[in-house]
Every structure is written in C-alpha cells, then in structure tokens.
Amino acid sequence: MEKKTPERQIQAKKYLDEYDIENVISEMLNSLLHEKDPHPYVYMIKYLASLMTEDERKEFNLEIPEPYPTAHPVVKYPHFSDSCKNLLKKYLNRDSFVKLKKIKTKFGNNINSMTKLTELLPDDKIGCILSDGDCINSYYDFLIPIIDEAHKINSKKLDEYQINSYSKIFNCDLGLNELKGYLKKLIFSFSRNVQEFPFNNFSAGNNKIAEVAEFLQSQIEDKIGQGSLPQMKKYELSKNKDEIDNILKKINFNEKWMISANLKQSWPENRFVYISNDNSIIILINFCDHLQVLKLFNENDLDIEKGYNELIEIIQQLSLVITFETHKQYGYLTTNINLIGDGFKILSDIILKNTDKIPIEGSNINEFLNGCNFDDIVINKEGNDIHYITSNSCKLSMKMDIFINLYINQLAGMSKLFNNNKEGKKISFDRINLQDSKDIVFQNIKDAYEETFDEIKYNLSSSGTNINNRIEPVFKGYIPNNLGILFKDKSEYLSFSPFVRNYLLKSQGFDINIKEHIHGKEENYNLVSIEGEELNKIESLHVYLFRNIDGFSFPSSKDNSNDQIEKLIKEAIVNINSKEKIIEYYSLTENKTEADKIIKENKLIFHCEKLVNGGIDSDFPKNRGILKFLNFPYIFGVVNDICHIKFCISMQNPKEKMSPHLVHLVKMNNEFFRYLKFNYNKQIGFMTASPIYLGTGMRIELKMKLNKLRFEDVKKKLENTEFVAENNKDGIVIINKTTIGESETYLLCKLLENVKNIIKNDL
C-alpha cells in the first residue's frame, strides 16, 4: 500500500516552493563557499539583504550597509514535468548539460538564466529564453536546433539578416470584410533590446536596468520634442500602477510569461509606459524586453497598411539614435526566442460563434486552433460571446508582409467558417490520397500537396477554404490535367504559399523565397529583329496572357462577381478607345452570333463552359465576352473564363509577320494594366487561377511541321531552354515550360530564336 504524505509535510513543501527558499539557500551557500568569507553569518545576512529592494529594507527597518555579496548561483539541471513537451526538453540532456553548466556569457549569465521558464511555465512551447545578446554565441550548438525548429529554418542555409531593411509598402486588403463586427482587437508590436546590456531578466542586480530606462527615456523624449514621434504621455509604474495596469490589460499583456521568464526583478522600479494622445501607440520600457512599441487598431477602422507604416516609421526613428542588439544571422535578439528576427508580433481578439456546430469534419474547435500554430491562445467568455485571443510572431522563415497577410487571412477564414457560414460549408483536414500520374503537371501538383500538407493543412484563406478545397476537384477529375489546380482568389496563394513554392520549384526550379518575378523587366530584346523566312514553316501560334483583377475572387469560384468584372473591362475599353476605336466587345449573350463566329473561326476556348463541377460558376455564358482588336486580326481577348481576362494571339498558317502582333499583345496588356489593377505579387507575379501560369501568366503553343528532324531531335535541342516539345499527330508543338522570373518579351524572343534555329537545321 502506498504511503500517504502527511498534510504538514505537503504544506511545508508548498511554502518552500512558493518562496523558492530551497533554491535561495543553496545559492547563498554556494556563494559563501566560493568566497570563503571569514565572517560567514555576516556574509549570509548581507546576501539575503541583497535580494530585497531598498524600499523593502526600509519598510522592515533593516539597516544593512553595502557592499552586498556577489551571487554565485548553483547551476542545476532543470526539472521537467512529465507533461512537458517543449523544445528545451527535446534538445537538452544530462550529458550535454555537463559542458553547458560551465559556460557563461560575457554578461555573466549561465544556462539556468535561460531555462527557468520551463520549470515555472512547463506548457511553454520552447521552454527557454535568451538572457542577453551573447547567448547565441556562447551556447550556439545548444540553441541552434531549438531556434531552427521554432522558426522552421535551417541555420546552415540561412542568409545574413538585413538589419533595418524595413519595407513600408505592402498590400493587405484581404478578408477585412469578413472580420467586421467580430474582430475586437488587433495589435502589432516590435520588440527590441539595447546593445551591450543584459536583457531585463538579469539586469537588476547591477543596476543596468536603471541605465537602460534612463537612456531610452531620453531618446524617446528627444524624438517627441523634435516631432519625429507622436505626442505621448509618460507613466511610471512605481507611481502610476493603476493607469499602467489598465494599459497592460488593454493590450492583453502576458504577465504570467513575464513572471515565469524571471523578468520581474526589482519590480516595479525603472518600468515606464508612453501612450500617444489618440491611444493608438504604446511604448513599454523594461517589461519583457528593453523596448516594445505597439500599434493598436480601432475595430471600426482597420487600415492595416496605414497602421503598419506608422509603426515602421516609429521604429525607424528610434533606430537612428539607438543601437539594438542583433545577430548577423538571426536579426534582432529578444528575450522570447519566437520573436528573434524582426521582433514583430501580432495579437488579436476575435469573437467566434457557432463553434458548437462544427463545420470541421472529424475535428473540433480546440484541435483546429492547436493546429493553427499560434504562439498563444486564450479563450474568454464575455456575456454570450466567446473571445479567442491569439498571438503569433514573425518567424525567420517568413517575410513580414507575407506573415501579416497570412495572419489576417487566418482570422478572416475562421470568421467565415464560424460566423458567416451561410452555406453550411464543411472543411476537412484529412489528407486526400492522390494516385501517381504520367502527366507531369498533375504529378507535380500531387507531390507538392503531399510534401507540404502537414505544414499547411490548417491554413485558411480569407474565404474559409483550405488546401483540400482546391485538391478535391483535382482528385475527383473535375479539372483537366493540363490546368492542374484552380485557386479561388489571391488569399489562397498567400495562405497556401508553401504548396505554391514547392510546386514552382518542381515545375520550374524557381524559389519564391529567394527570387522575385518583376513585371516589365524587358532587358534588351527586340521581337522585330528576330523575324526571318524560317518562321514561314510555322503552322500555328497561340499565345495567351492570363490576368485577374485585384479585389475580386477569380472566375474559378462560385461566389465571383462576373457582372462587375465585365463592367470594369468595358470601362477600360472606353478609355482605351477614347482617341481611336481599336477594340470591339462582343457579349456571348447580347452579341451571340458574332461572338460564336469569332470563337469558331479562331479556335478560341472557354474552359469554364466545361468546368461547372470543378467550382466554376454555372451561369455560362452570362457576363462572358470576346474582345476583338480591330487593327490586329489575330489578337483577341476572352472575358471571365478561368481568369477575368485572357489576351490571346491565334494565328493559323500565318501569312503575315508575327512580331507586330506579339509586340501589340504585350502593349495591349500594358494598356489595360493602366486602367485595371491586376492581381500581382512581386514574388509570384500575376496571380492566375492556375499556378501553372504564375509569373508572366503566359502560355505559348507553337506548332510546326519539319522535313528531316524527328521529335527526339527537337526535344534534345530544347534541353536547357525555357521550352519543351510535345509530339502531336499533326506536328511538333513547342510549349513554354517557364512562366516566372522572365518577362513576356524575353520569352517570346527566345521562342522565335529557338524555332529559327530548329528550322535552319531542318532545311
């Protein structure tokens, strides 16, 4: 029979743990043995006095003169609870601890200064902190696996961090309508530490925290006086506790984490808060880090871009006069390992309704939230509303603008699923089993899905979809293999970006995390100069430029706005025709006879006519139409197919020179770009419904008949080029395999150059 622990013993243990007495006594004895002071009792009294604040000593009439002994803490292997599953427990073992316990940073901090968090807050996902800017250098081999897993990076492949490389411009208009009325709080923040000072958890003993506070106050107040920062009111925690408590409550300050990370030494001295006159900007001094600058958004005015740029301006101004602690690989160093890099964090408070009517197949709200990989989740009930308070930090593996968009998308998707799910839409996070295929497009889609599924399966677009919603039509055979997969809107490209990156790496060797697609990068290529009699051997040429208009879901979704798209395109035509009529529009409903004739004669295609089951709107041919360019009989436009507009050249047995038409195609694309804001992203270029066209949005199909050369000869000649050959019963078809990273003009020039060389070899 198991012996029961006496109640008195339980209470005694509880008392010792509450005041950390065993640890204090062991560290005091360690310090005494280290110094071997000839007056041990006096030494111990002074040691204990050093643990109290000056105010506490006065309160209890303790007059104990300085100097106080220097602490020599006992370095102990951290205690891990049975339920603890953090990264510290995963990567720390007793063998490695033998070496680590002997190491100190240049500020005198040891391994226990980083690991106390795991004992006080075993649920923390990481379990350790950085106590100063020298931690990574001193404990490199120990910390790197933890940083790599927390940030989903490989330090061996990590480029040097670009300090102060803030970008003010980014596009974040996704999903905000879904959040109206439900998003009660949204806060952006930057955290920084001053160089050559230990961080707040071990600054108190040598009064460094006071130096940091004095320095930061002087710099902030100078900037306010110069008008470089907004007018702000200052509060001192030791004098304005109630006011500061209200501010901390307003921003959902995580006091539990701060206490567990041992950041309340000498509390409340040398803690200050600045708040702007409009209450939207808050600056914290000496809380979790030396400096934290926050932007609070008004739930009725979610101007994300303006607020973000305002915050960037403040942190840039402070960077001019303050040197922050950085690492050449890991960027800005913060106490919280999740925050290193940009030091950027988002916190939000969103109301979710109907969570009991789960739209998630085989799962529940808690499982889903845990899968979302938020750093923190707190659930509060206020009246009839349940508030989900989540926060996340921008990891080293992600660019800040993409991180913000992803976070906003996730919130919008959650709101769509639970608050605005009028269709009763369900969503599944179970892996779909796809069969291997000989079709390279389909196989690349399959492989990209399988390799990134676990990473992105809980990622939601602003319309509440996940990657399975896009893969399911492929799985059921609703979408032809040559289209691969059809996305619904640009938010899906951001939410499923790991899948998109993987697919582009497989299909084109293009890494969107490293390279960018820049539209209009024409180099020095001249289409006209490539003309030649060899091109007369070409039987047909089809060139397509796919474009979608910003602010609308793609036509490949059922909730698109085809009527608005058609109206915008008609307005653009009126503007382009204002000087001279060069474009005629034929509606498939109002001008059916003429439109059908143009489609038949020029072999134009409407994919959407055959893709109703694949998620395409079923109202075909409503709001569809054809553009005819009057001076260029081989150039057309198709409205509201799988993209909002498709510019195309369709030349059968061309008798005329091709270059003028190719030049005009690019010109007309740019002309429409003046009046229509196309969906464009500098990483992936023009956002087309199918990722196989990303970048230029271009598809080229050129057919020719040869006398001598066989298909295998042509295929070999196109190796290491941007093109591939396909064997067709009527001839050889050359198709561009490259769509991203090069300009439209470059690809067209390279096409004609390669075709000329092939035909020369055939003559």
Question: Where in the sequence are the language-model features?
Answer:
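Short hydrophobic alpha-helical segments that form membrane-spanning helices or hydrophobic packing faces
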Residues: 26-27, 41-48, 344-350, 698-704
